[in-house]
Each structure stands twice: as structure tokens, then as C-alpha cells.
């Protein structure tokens, strides 16, 4: 009896093995249930919906995005350092030239360049602070330090403009009240009284020195303007753009100083203090403009619509997005923070709608490097909006 039972068990085992080979491997339970759970909007051929992206795609892109910011930040920092070094050289050159030639305009420009050293230092420190990584106390980063630095620069520009205007007006008043035959001597004696008691008339033996240094300053500052301007536009840095226009204002003020030197050499001394007044006016304008832009960023003013329109076009080009509204943004230094409402088909699954939102985020940060973060609210397409789309 035991032999028969063992023989029967062996036969059953061989039959089961043979049946398994004929049928092949049994499908997994998830494979049987998946077709029943598929969204009616997903393709039936088994392919991935064309609006979906792998979840790792956003993480990988985020790493690449920050790496690009790091490389661009190093290049921008070098530009700030270059501007600081140039300001030191120009300040020394203008101060020596103003001392030798006795030109009020060049002396005023030297004082302006001295303030430029401080301003360039503040700009560099503000930029480095703004590029510090996020931490627990600053979850949105340190971008506002750029705006604070620009506001500090504007305040110092206003003070510098006031000091130069006061000195130039004082000299001009002395020139206008002097007798015509001694107008040159009196004006420069008055200027020397404000310069620690040293008398500096217009030294006609050094006109070439005065003109050469001024022309050199114009060339250097104009070159710094273009370098800084292009870097600021590429990175979207308001601080760099303001610093670029500051370099441009320095170049123009040097042109005015050049006119003042020429007027003094030609025997028209009142052009010298008038040039100083024009320089102070240009510095005043730069300070007001920089301060206004900085305050707008600090109070989270609305971003220019011309900056948001390309981003909206990028959103509407994403497959699955059927509408876009309430696109808003605020700036924090070089970074732009956005929030937007998008509309999708009402019968999509939650995961499909989420993947569309991730695709929108991916495309925005891919096409617009200045965007640091996007908050996306996903809603269903309303029947009233279908005809409009």
C-alpha cells in the first residue's frame, strides 16, 4: 500500500510540472488588474502618456540647475572684483591728476571714484551673501541681500552727489562774484582753501596729463559697463545691472570732467564748477533709480508683465495643459519665485494631473534659468472656458 501511494504522488508531481511548461509562467496579479485601473485618457497600446515625465527627471534637472548657478555665480563674482580693482586704480590716478592740474571737475570725479571703492565693496559682499545656500532660518534663500546691497549703494550715491554739488556750487559762487580780470585766480584760490590750504591754479604744464587720465577713465568705465551689463542680463541680477549703470554714469561724469578741464585750459573757468554740478546731478539720478528698483524688490512688487509673458507661453505649450491664469511672481535678487494656476481635463487621474504639473515645472526651469521655485495649483477645465481655448 505504501508503494502504491508513493507511486501515485510521483505521477501527480510529473503531471503538474508538464502542465506548467505548457501554460508558461503565470502573470502577476498587478498585470491582471492594471488594465482595469487605467485612466480613460491614457493610451490603450501600453505606451506611456506623452505628457508624463519620469519622477527622477525633476530631481536630476534641479541638480543641473544649481550647478549652472554656481558656475555663473563665480564668473559674476570675478566681474565684481574686477570693478573693485579698477575703481582703486582710477581713484588714485584721478586724485593725483586733480592735485597737479587743480581741476575742480577732476577732483570731484576723484571723490566719486573714492565712493566707488566703497560701493563696489558693498556690491561684492552683497552678492556673495545673496549666493549663500538656503538654511533653516532662510528657507527661501538669501536673495534679498542683493536688494539690500543695491539700496545701500543708492543711499551712498545720494550722499556723494550732495557733497559734490555743495563743493561745486561753492566754487561757482566764488567765480561768479570775482572780478573778470582775476576770475581764474580767485576761483582756484577758493578751491585750494577747501583742500587743506594748498593753492592749485590751473597748471598749463600738465594739460596732457589731465586729458589723458580722464580719457583713460572713460574707456575703463565704459568697458566695465558693457561687461557688467551683459553678465547682469544673462544672470538676471538687478544688483549687477545697477552696478553696470553705475559704471556708465562714471564714464559720463568723466566726459563732463573732461569738458571742465578743457574749459579751464581755454580760459573759461566757470565751466569747471558747472561740470562738477552736472556730475552730481548724474550721480543723483543713478542713486534715485537704483534705490527705487531696490525698494520695489524688497516690498515684493509685481514682476514686469513682459517678464511673465514668455513663461506663460512656455506653460501653455506643455501637453495636457488646457488653461493658465493667475501667474504671479516676485523677485529676490537674481531669483524669481512664481505661483500659477493651470487647468487640465476634469476626468484625468490624480497621478496624471500631478505629472502634468511636474512637466510644467520642469519646462519652466529648463527654459527660464532665473526661476528658482514654482508653486503650481492644478484645477479642472471649466466648461465655460472650453470655447475660449
Curated annotation (Swiss-Prot):
Parts of the chain on the Vacuolar side: 103-104, 170-206, 272-275
Membrane topology summary: Multi-pass membrane protein
Transmembrane intervals: 82-102, 105-125, 149-169, 207-227, 251-271, 276-296
Keywords attached to this entry: Ion transport, Membrane, Transmembrane, Transmembrane helix, Transport, Vacuole
Family: Belongs to the cation diffusion facilitator (CDF) transporter (TC 2.A.4) family. SLC30A subfamily.
PANTHER family cross-referenced by the UniProt entry: MITOCHONDRIAL METAL TRANSPORTER 1-RELATED
Main location per the UniProt record: membrane
Keyword Methyltransferase part of the UniProt annotation: no
An annotated Gene Ontology molecular function: monoatomic cation transmembrane transporter activity
Name of the protein: Metal tolerance protein 2
A single Gene Ontology CC term: vacuolar membrane
InterPro entries: Cation_efflux, Cation_efflux_CTD, Cation_efflux_CTD_sf, Cation_efflux_TMD_sf, CDF_Transporter
Keyword Transmembrane helix: yes
Compartment(s) where it occurs, according to its Swiss-Prot or TrEMBL record: Vacuole membrane
Cytoplasmic side: 1-81, 126-148, 228-250, 297-389
Superkingdom of the organism of origin: Eukaryota
Gene3D superfamilies linked: Cation efflux protein transmembrane domain (1.20.1510.10), Cation efflux protein, cytoplasmic domain (3.30.70.1350)
Function: Involved in sequestration of excess metal in the cytoplasm into vacuoles to maintain metal homeostasis.
Amino acid at each position: 500500500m505504501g508503494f502504491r501511494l508513493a507511486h501515485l504522488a510521483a505521477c501527480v508531481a510529473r503531471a503538474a510540472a508538464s502542465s506548467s511548461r505548457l501554460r508558461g509562467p503565470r502573470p502577476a496579479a498587478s498585470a491582471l488588474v492594471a488594465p482595469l485601473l487605467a485612466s480613460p485618457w491614457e493610451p490603450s497600446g501600453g505606451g506611456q502618456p506623452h505628457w508624463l515625465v519620469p519622477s527622477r527627471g525633476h530631481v536630476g534637472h534641479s541638480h543641473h540647475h544649481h550647478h549652472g548657478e554656481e558656475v555663473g555665480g563665480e564668473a559674476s563674482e570675478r566681474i565684481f572684483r574686477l570693478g573693485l580693482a579698477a575703481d582703486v586704480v582710477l581713484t588714485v590716478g584721478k586724485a593725483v591728476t586733480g592735485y597737479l592740474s587743480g581741476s575742480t571737475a577732476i577732483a570731484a570725479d576723484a571723490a566719486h571714484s573714492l565712493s566707488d571703492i566703497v560701493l563696489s565693496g558693498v556690491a561684492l559682499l552683497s552678492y556673495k551673501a545673496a549666493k549663500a545656500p538656503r538654511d533653516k532660518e532662510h528657507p527661501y534663500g538669501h536673495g534679498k541681500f542683493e536688494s539690500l546691497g543695491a539700496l545701500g549703494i543708492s543711499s551712498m550715491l545720494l550722499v556723494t552727489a550732495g557733497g559734490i554739488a555743495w563743493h561745486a556750487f561753492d566754487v561757482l559762487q566764488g567765480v561768479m562774484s570775482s572780478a573778470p580780470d582775476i576770475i581764474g585766480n580767485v576761483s582756484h584760490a577758493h578751491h585750494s582753501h577747501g583742500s587743506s590750504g594748498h593753492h592749485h591754479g590751473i597748471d598749463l604744464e600738465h594739460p596732457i596729463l589731465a586729458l589723458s587720465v580722464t580719457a583713460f577713465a572713460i574707456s575703463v568705465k565704459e568697458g566695465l559697463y558693457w561687461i557688467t551689463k551683459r553678465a547682469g542680463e544673462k544672470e538676471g541680477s538687478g544688483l549687477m545691472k545697477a552696478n553696470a549703470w553705475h559704471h556708465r554714469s562714471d564714464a559720463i561724469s568723466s566726459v563732463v570732467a573732461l569738458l571742465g578741464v578743457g574749459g579751464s585750459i581755454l580760459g573759461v573757468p566757470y565751466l569747471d564748477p558747472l561740470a562738477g554740478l552736472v556730475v552730481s546731478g548724474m550721480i543723483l539720478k543713478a542713486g534715485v533709480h537704483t534705490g527705487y528698483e531696490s525698494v520695489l524688490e524688497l516690498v515684493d512688487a509685481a514682476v514686469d508683465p513682459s517678464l511673465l509673458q514668455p513663461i506663460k507661453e512656455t506653460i501653455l505649450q506643455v501637453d495636457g495643459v488646457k488653461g493658465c491664469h493667475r501667474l504671479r511672481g516676485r523677485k529676490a535678487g537674481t531669483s524669481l519665485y512664481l505661483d500659477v494656476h493651470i487647468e487640465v481635463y476634469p476626468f484625468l487621474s490624480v497621478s496624471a494631473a500631478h505629472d502634468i504639473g511636474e512637466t510644467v515645472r520642469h519646462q519652466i526651469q529648463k527654459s527660464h534659468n532665473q526661476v528658482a521655485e514654482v508653486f503650481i495649483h492644478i484645477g479642472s477645465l471649466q466648461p465655460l472656458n472650453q470655447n475660449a481655448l
